[in-house]
Regions:
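N-terminal export signals
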Residues: 13-33
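N-terminal secretory signal peptides
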Residues: 1-13, 22
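Short, glycine-/small- and polar/acidic-enriched structural segments
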Residues: 36-187, 191-195, 210-211
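Short amphipathic alpha-helical segments with coiled-coil-like heptad repeat character
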Residues: 1, 23, 74-78
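Loop-centered beta-sheet repeat module
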Residues: 200-212
Length: 212
């Protein structure tokens, strides 16, 4: 065991460290933390997975504009096809980091619907921004809002299909909550499927789903 836990620091230094805890470590503590190590990056090259959505911009542009170089690392962006693929590559080590859904991180950390592995959220890339979309076919029949959708489903009963991008993602949670608020059971009254974000519009166009 090192002396890190037993080293006595002035009260003023400890209070300063607490004040900046959200953004970094005070110099006195940093010196102790790195007494046995180095400030050099653990890896010179880091592979970061992303799905082509607007909130991946921070990752992609950091590489394009060379922001990574001043920190002594090289970012290798890796375009992925689905959130499930990103999850699997994070778990097996093919990716070092990834642009992911908050719910995906917690799902992996808790071992929900797959292998359990410790995860950490290092940066927030967006704050919500999701939207719920209904097909033009439904809109043409008056389903331009939730009440209209509920009325149409009662008037024309059939299997209605809605898509979300990942079972533990906020998209799924918002969709389920939205449907349930109108008395529509998202697990019994409609069919819910998983579709990767880049494939949503194409699936809507060919009629594979009624909304997402």
């Amino acid at each position: 065991m090192t002396d890190l836990l037993t080293t006595r620091l002035p009260r003023r230094t400890v209070l300063q460290a607490a004040a900046v805890g959200a953004v970094g470590i005070c110099p006195a503590l940093r010196a102790l933390v790195h007494a046995q190590g180095s400030d050099a990056p653990e890896k010179k090259e880091v592979k970061i997975g992303f799905i082509p959505l607007t909130d991946c911009a921070s990752v992609v542009m950091a590489s394009v504009l060379g922001f990574d170089k001043k920190h002594g690392v090289t970012i290798v962006p890796s375009k992925e096809a689905s959130w499930a693929g990103v999850r699997d590559k994070l778990v097996n080590g093919e990716l070092d980091f990834a642009h992911v859904l908050y719910g995906l991180v917690y799902g992996v950390h808790l071992g929900l619907a797959g292998p359990k592995k410790d995860m950490a959220v290092l940066m927030t890339l967006n704050r919500n921004g999701q939207g719920l979309t209904l097909s033009k076919a439904l809109a043409d029949k008056g389903a331009t809002h939730l009440a209209g959708l509920a009325a149409l489903m009662k008037k024309e009963p059939r299997e209605y299909t809605f898509a979300q991008t990942f079972p533990t993602g906020t998209h799924a949670m918002w969709l389920y909550y939205w449907l349930a608020s109108a008395g529509i059971d998202p697990f019994k009254d409609v069919k819910c499927i998983v579709v990767p974000p880049p494939q949503m519009v194409a699936n809507m166009r060919v009629g594979n789903m009624d909304g997402f």
